[in-house]
Each structure stands twice: as structure tokens, then as C-alpha cells.
């Protein structure tokens, strides 16, 4: 583990850029960027277009390590190059800590939650992540209803996989998303917090994790988790809120920082000039940084 990167993730001012839309969500991400499905004829062309978009983001002067602590990549992005370097090396040289999305998507809903599908090639994927100088990983589950058994299952699965990731020298981001439209969202979050605390308390002192959570209904609910000795940082997802709304809610949570995907890229378009693109990205970065650092 890179100690300098760990220090930056633990104490740095800023947020994490989530650039990890995978195969399933790529056509949608490209469409929002202004690239329609008739502009590519196969998966390779599609992934090249999305890599071009991400390259444009990470090489922009607005993608500044003074504001952006880390970036989460999709497996395809990790294996491609930016300006002649593997993406993670390009980011690290720029001062941005690279993470890799490792999950294979969500299973069918059961007990009000969606567990992660089995990650069958996890070991070899983590070995490749180490070769590519990745610092940490991210994996997402989804909680839709107040169901204690379901929430428990989500957290247990996350910690089980997290321990395999830690054993390979990487820092896992555990992401049990709570659907922002869930009927009992505030109650779900209390149960989730208790389960996460149990999982954290069962870790050895040297087993470090990060958490990526939905912004809680009750401000500062996750403060105790953020201060847990095994937690490097707690980050939040935008979860379907607009950037403005997500930023507003984030400002009410003292120890949390953003890890936004859609809310970061929502104003970026393929047809923008360099100046327009850099300004749109810069405005987004500025506002998300502000919500992550300057609290109410």
C-alpha cells in the first residue's frame, strides 16, 4: 500500500471522482455526453468512445489534484492508456489516487436488497490491479427496503469480500447504497449503521476500509463511522439527486466527502469546445469540492 496515497485519502481536502460506469451503464453515460448509439457499431468502439470521454476529463486542467483526491475506474479504463501511460499511473503522477470498481453488478432483489453477483475472477483481478498500481477498490450493493435480514446480508457480503481485497494489499470501498426513494430511508440507515459498526469492530487493527454511502436523512448519522479507527474515509454517492441537491445535503454532514459520478459529469458534452468543456467540468468540481470541504 502506498503510504503517501493513504495519507492523502485519510486527510486530504477534496473528493473522489467516480468514473466507473461499466458495460451496462455505458450507453446511457455516452448518450448524456451527447454520443448516440448510432455513432458506434460494437462494444470495442463504445468502450473507446467512453475512454475518450474519460481521457478528456482526467487530462483537463479542471481535473485538479488540489480538489480531487481520487478517481474510481472501470476495469476497461485500468487497462487502457492516457497520454502514453496506463490510466492509474497517469492519475497517480498527477496526484490523484486510483481505485478500481471490482463488482460484477447486482443480483436479483431478495429480502428488500440486491446483493452483489459473485465476483468469480476476484483474485486475478486484484493481482492485475496491483500490477497497474491501483490503491483501492469499490463494490456496490443496493438496499431498497427496511428488512433487517437483507441489510445484514448486504453488510456481511461486503465485509467478506473486503477482507479478500485487504489481503491483497488494497483498500476496499464498501458501498451499500440505500435507494433515495426507499419508504423508510431514515430507519434503513440506522440499521445499516449498526451493521456496519459491527463489521468494522470485527476487523483487525491493520484492516483498513472506506465506506461509500447514500447521504443520510439524519445529518451526521455516520459521524461515528467516519471516526472509526479502521475507516480511512467515508464518501457519499449522489444517488439520483441533482448535483445542487446532493451538494446541499452533503454540506450538512461534517465528516463526509463526495464520490459523485453522474453529478460530476452531468454538464459535459462531446460537442463542447475545450474552453466550454473545461469550464463546465471546473464549475462542477468547484461546487462538489465546496460541499465536501466547507460545511454548514
Swiss-Prot record:
InterPro entries: Aldolase_TIM, FBA_I, FBA_I_Gram+-type. Keywords: Glycolysis, Lyase, Schiff base. GO terms for biological process: glycolytic process. Its EC number is 4.1.2.13. Gene3D superfamilies: Aldolase class I. It catalyses: beta-D-fructose 1,6-bisphosphate = D-glyceraldehyde 3-phosphate + dihydroxyacetone phosphate. The active site is at residues 175, 212. This is Fructose-bisphosphate aldolase class 1. The lineage of its organism: Bacteria, Bacillati, Bacillota, Bacilli, Bacillales. The gene is fda.
Amino acid at each position: 500500500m502506498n503510504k503517501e496515497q493513504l495519507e492523502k485519502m485519510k486527510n486530504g481536502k477534496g473528493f473522489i471522482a467516480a468514473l466507473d460506469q461499466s458495460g451496462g451503464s455505458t450507453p446511457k453515460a455516452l448518450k448524456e455526453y451527447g454520443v448516440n448509439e448510432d455513432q458506434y457499431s460494437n462494444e470495442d468502439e463504445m468502450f473507446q468512445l467512453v475512454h475518450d470521454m474519460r481521457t478528456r476529463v482526467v487530462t483537463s486542467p479542471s481535473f485538479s489534484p488540489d480538489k480531487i483526491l481520487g478517481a474510481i475506474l472501470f476495469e476497461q479504463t485500468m487497462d487502457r492508456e492516457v497520454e502514453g501511460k496506463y490510466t492509474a499511473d497517469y492519475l497517480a503522477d498527477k496526484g490523484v489516487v486510483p481505485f478500481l470498481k471490482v463488482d460484477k453488478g447486482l443480483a436479483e432483489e431478495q429480502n428488500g436488497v440486491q446483493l452483489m453477483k459473485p465476483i468469480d475472477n476476484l483474485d486475478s483481478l486484484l493481482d492485475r490491479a496491483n500490477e497497474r498500481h491501483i490503491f483501492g477498490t469499490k463494490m456496490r450493493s443496493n438496499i431498497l427496503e427496511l428488512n433487517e435480514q437483507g441489510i445484514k446480508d448486504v453488510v456481511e457480503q461486503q465485509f467478506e469480500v473486503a477482507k479478500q481485497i485487504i489481503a491483497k494489499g488494497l483498500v476496499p470501498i464498501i458501498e451499500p447504497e440505500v435507494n433515495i426513494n426507499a419508504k423508510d430511508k431514515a430507519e434503513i440507515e440506522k440499521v445499516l449503521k449498526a451493521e456496519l459498526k459491527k463489521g468494522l469492530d470485527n476487523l483487525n487493527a491493520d484492516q483498513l476500509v472506506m465506506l461509500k454511502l447514500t447521504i443520510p436523512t439524519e445529518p451526521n448519522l455516520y459521524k461515528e463511522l467516519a471516526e472509526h479507527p479502521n475507516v480511512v474515509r467515508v464518501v457519499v454517492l449522489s444517488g439520483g439527486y441533482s448535483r445542487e441537491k446532493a451538494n446541499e445535503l452533503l454540506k450538512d454532514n461534517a465528516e463526509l466527502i463526495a464520490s459523485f459520478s453522474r453529478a460530476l459529469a452531468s454538464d459535459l458534452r462531446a460537442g463542447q469546445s475545450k474552453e466550454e468543456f473545461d469550464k463546465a467540468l471546473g464549475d462542477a468540481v468547484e461546487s462538489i469540492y465546496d460541499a465536501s470541504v466547507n460545511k454548514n
